[in-house]
Amino acid sequence: MEQDDRLLNAMFEMCNHKNPLNDGQREWHIADIPGLLREERYDELDERYNQALTESFTSREAEKRYFFAWNQMDNPFYDMDTLVEAGPQGLALIKNWQRARPRSTHAWLAEAQYWNHRAWLYRSYGWARETTRAMWICAAACNERMVIAALNAIDCEPRQWMAAALISTNSKVFGQPEWLVEFLVGADV
């Protein structure tokens, strides 16, 4: 047990050195998504995130900024945190954004990240051997919703690499929905 604690502490220390602090020189935060959604400032959200996505193609720092804004794992700079933690109320705000801007890649990416978070909550962030059959079933259902939202995000903006990254990462853990596998192998779906 003591050895496990030392190993975990060493891993946390290593991760902390990889992720620089969010100081004045390095701002990972792009926008207060929940606040702007509550105020229905959809154009501002889309403008900020579209600009960040565009910048991510030409700058490693901008790529990190965009990645950390959307990546929840062990990340204090995650723009979506309070929105996904709000549960159904957070999802309702995202759905309002989608209704107002159905071609917004980031409105769909927000939903993908919402379902991604839910899938991992059901799966549990601990060891997989602690995950019950019921938890796996719920996680798979959330993952399927995540895949659908991520594909919509990519349909709106084919260069939407964060949605592709979510699908790729989760396929290793949850697999892919059967209908997607059939589609990818050329079956009529």
Regions found by a protein language model. Give the residues of each.
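Membrane-embedded glycan transfer/ligation machinery
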Residues: L109
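Non-catalytic protein-protein interaction scaffold segments in large eukaryotic complex-forming proteins
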Residues: M1-H29
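Short coil/linker segments at helix-helix boundaries
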Residues: H17, G24-E39, D43-R103, Q113-V189
